[in-house]
Amino acid sequence: MDLKQYVSEVQDWPKPGVSFKDITTIMDNGEAYGYATDQIVKYAKDRDVDVVVGPEARGFIIGCPVAYSMGIGFAPVRKEGKLPREVIRYEYDLEYGTNILTMHNDAIKPGQRVLITDDLLATGGTIEAAIKLVEKLGGIVVGIAFIIELKYLNGIEKIKDYDVMSLISYDE
């Protein structure tokens, strides 16, 4: 299935000059959403994954159906102040400022094999932060799966030491 045909491109959003790749139109179509989920599940099964991790919010949209399909758990990565129990945190730089992501400190057990999912790989900052959190808890990142990779932003460089799959890529 050509998933790219289900991606909506919104010009000049969220700011002028940006061509936003909207995956909600994949989710609007049950066949396309199911296909995307199934492809990531196949990838994950080949890596003997114990738990799926996803950053808010679209990482939840991708990761939860994958975890459910595999009969395994899902561990959320959230912005600071959004998780109710004790957390670990990771602060990273953005273009203009910093961001902090957190996970419950018991979300991953040492040695667990982890798949990280998200909708899109752009600059790689969010996924790099998720990797740091998983590894801080002793998890082993065995794969990272995206619906879309924006190759022209070169985010893969931040995660080049990991096994990565993308269902769709844009070169420009």
UniProtKB/Swiss-Prot annotation:
Q: Which family does it belong to?
A: Belongs to the purine/pyrimidine phosphoribosyltransferase family.
Gene Ontology molecular functions: adenine binding; adenine phosphoribosyltransferase activity; AMP binding
Q: Where in the cell is it found?
A: Cytoplasm
* Pathway(s) the chain acts in: Purine metabolism; AMP biosynthesis via salvage pathway; AMP from adenine: step 1/1
Catalyzed chemical reaction(s):
AMP + diphosphate = 5-phospho-alpha-D-ribose 1-diphosphate + adenine
UniProt key word Cell division: no
Keywords, A to Z, come to: Cytoplasm, Glycosyltransferase, Purine salvage, Transferase
| Function of the protein | Catalyzes a salvage reaction resulting in the formation of AMP, that is energically less costly than de novo synthesis.
User: GO CC: one term?
Assistant: cytoplasm
Q: Does the keyword Cytoplasm apply?
A: yes
Please provide an example of a Pfam family that matches this protein in its UniProt record.
Pribosyltran
What GO terms in the biological process aspect are recorded for it?
A: adenine salvage; AMP salvage; purine ribonucleoside salvage
Q: Know the name of this protein?
A: Adenine phosphoribosyltransferase
Instruction: List the EC numbers from the record.
Output: 2.4.2.7
Upper classification of the organism: Bacteria, Bacillati, Bacillota, Bacilli, Bacillales
Cross-referenced PANTHER family: ADENINE PHOSPHORIBOSYLTRANSFERASE (PTHR32315:SF3)
Q: Which residues form the signal peptide?
A: none
Per the record, the major location class is cytoplasm
The UniProt subunit note reads as follows: Homodimer.
Q: Which SUPFAM superfamilies does the record associate with it?
A: PRTase-like
